[in-house]
C-alpha cells in the first residue's frame, strides 16, 4: 500500500460510535503499544515507515522505539521498483534505511513485498515476456532480495493483492503472462530462498469479513495445502473508513477462515480514515473502530500482531489517494496521541489483565 495505488471502497458494515474511554494515566500506561501488546499475548504491535520522513528526528524517535512499536514494515522501500530498478541491478538502499535502525532497536520486521501488481519498474511492465522468461525474472528477484535480507524478516508478504473484490483473479502482468499459478510459484520460490523459519504470507485488503474475496483466498489456501504449497499466514490489511468499517465479529469471522486451516493471521496495514473536517463524533467512532480491530486480533489465538499503516497523520497515504479524507493515524500533526491511541492502549491493557494467552 501507500502513495501510488488506490483502494476500492470496501462494502462494509456501518460502525456505530461509542464513548471513548478516559485516557490511561502515566502510571497505568508505563509501556508503549509494543510493550502492552506483548503483555496482552501478541507477538508485536508495529508500524509501517516510509523513507520520506526519516529526516524528522521526532518521528524516528517514536518509530524506532521498541516499547512503542516492537515491529516495523518498510511501506515502500522493499518493493520491486526500488529493489530492482533495472533488470539484474539490485539497490537495497531504501530498504536498509528502515531495516538497519530497526535491527539496532531490536524490533521485529515484516518485509513487504516480493510480488505485487503495482510499483513495478518500466523494464518489467513493458517487457515482451513469455511464461518461462517471466518466471525466471520472478525467481531471480525473490532469490536476490531474500538472500540480501536473510534472517532479517520475521515474515514476508510474498504475494500482495492478487484478487478482485468479487473473488476473481486480478488481471495484471503476472496473471496475464503466467496464469494463476504465478502465486504458487512465488510461494515456492520464497520458501526455497528465504531463511529457515521465515513466515510466508498472502496479504490483501477487503478480506476483513466473510465475503467473495476472503472466501477466494481461503479456497486458494485449501488448494495449496492439498498440494503442499508452502504458506504460513494471511495478512488482513484493514484499511477502514469511519463511515463504513467491519464489526469486531466480522474481523473475527474472517480470521477464522484462515486460522481454522492452521494458518496465523495479522492485521498488517491498519488505519481508519475519516471525512474532513474532523469533529468529536468522527474521532470517537475512529477510536472505537481502532479498538475493535485490535481486540479482534487479541482475542484470536493465532493472530500474531497488528501493524498500523504509519502512525503520524502528515505521512499517511490517505490524503493523496482519497480527496477530502485523512487523519487516519494514531498521532496528529503535532505528534499528539489521539483518542484512538488511548483506545488501543486500553484494549491491550485489558488483554494483559485478562490473561490473554500464548507465548511466542
Specify the residue positions occupied by each region the protein language model found:
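A cross-domain feature marking catalytic cores of carbohydrate-active enzymes
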Residues: 47-51, 74-76, 111-115, 157-160, ...
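Acidic-and-aromatic substrate-binding clefts and catalytic sites of carbohydrate-active enzymes
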Residues: 47-60, 80-93, 163-168, 207-215, ...
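Substrate-binding cleft and catalytic face of glycoside hydrolase catalytic domains
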Residues: 34, 67-85, 93-207
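Fungal secretory targeting signals
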Residues: 1-25
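Glycoside hydrolase catalytic-domain groove-lining segments
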Residues: 93-108, 177-200, 211-278, 291-299, ...
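Boundary/entry segment of secreted carbohydrate-active catalytic domains
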Residues: 24-75
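Short, acidic/polar
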Residues: 51-68, 135-146, 212-224, 287-296
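Aromatic-rich peripheral "rim/lid" segments of glycoside hydrolase catalytic domains that contact
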Residues: 28-36, 63, 84, 122-123, ...
Amino acid at each position: 500500500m501507500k502513495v501510488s495505488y488506490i483502494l476500492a471502497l470496501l462494502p462494509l458494515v456501518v460502525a456505530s460510535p461509542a464513548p471513548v474511554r478516559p485516557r490511561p494515566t502515566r502510571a497505568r500506561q508505563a509501556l508503549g503499544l509494543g510493550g502492552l501488546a506483548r503483555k496482552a499475548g501478541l507477538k508485536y504491535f508495529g508500524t509501517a515507515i516510509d523513507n520520506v520522513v526519516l529526516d524528522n528526528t521526532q518521528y524516528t524517535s517514536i518509530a524506532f522505539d521498541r516499547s512503542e512499536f516492537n515491529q516495523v514494515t518498510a511501506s515502500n522501500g522493499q518493493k520491486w521498483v526500488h529493489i530492482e530498478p533495472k533488470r539484474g541491478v539490485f539497490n537495497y538502499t531504501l530498504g536498509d534505511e528502515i531495516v538497519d535502525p530497526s535491527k539496532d532497536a531490536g524490533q521485529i520486521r515484516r518485509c513487504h513485498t516480493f510480488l505485487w501488481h503495482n510499483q513495478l519498474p518500466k523494464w518489467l511492465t513493458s517487457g515482451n515476456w513469455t511464461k518461462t522468461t517471466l518466471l525466471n525474472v520472478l525467481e531471480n528477484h525473490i532469490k536476490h532480495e531474500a538472500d540480501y535480507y536473510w534472517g532479517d524478516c520475521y515474515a514476508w508478504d510474498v504475494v500482495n493483492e492478487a484478487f478482485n473484490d468479487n473473488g476473481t483473479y486480478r488481471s495484471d502482468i503476472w496473471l496475464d503472462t503466467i496464469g494463476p499459478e504465478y502465486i504458487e510459484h512465488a510461494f515456492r520460490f520464497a520458501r526455497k530462498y528465504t531463511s529457515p523459519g521465515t513466515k510466508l504470507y498472502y496479504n490483501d485488503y477487503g478480506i476483513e469479513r466473510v465475503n467473495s474475496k476472503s472466501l477466494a483466498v481461503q479456497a486458494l489456501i485449501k488448494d495449496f495445502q492439498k498440494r503442499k504449497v508452502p504458506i504460513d499466514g494471511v495478512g488482513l490489511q484493514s484499511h477502514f473508513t469511519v463511515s463504513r468499517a467491519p464489526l469486531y465479529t466480522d474481523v473475527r469471522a474472517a480470521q477464522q477462515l484462515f486460522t481454522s486451516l492452521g494458518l496465523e493471521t495479522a492485521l498488517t496495514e491498519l488505519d481508519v480514515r475519516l471525512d474532513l473536517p474532523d469533529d468529536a463524533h468522527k474521532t470517537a467512532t475512529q477510536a472505537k473502530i481502532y479498538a475493535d480491530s485490535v481486540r479482534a486480533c487479541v482475542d484470536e489465538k493465532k493472530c500474531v500482531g497488528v501493524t498500523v499503516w504509519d502512525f503520524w497523520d502528515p505521512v499517511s497515504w490517505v490524503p493523496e489517494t482519497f480527496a477530502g479524507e485523512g487523519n487516519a493515524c494514531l498521532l496528529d500533526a503535532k505528534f499528539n496521541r489521539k483518542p484512538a491511541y488511548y483506545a488501543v492502549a486500553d484494549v491491550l491493557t485489558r488483554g494483559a489483565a485478562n490473561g490473554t494467552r500464548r507465548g511466542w
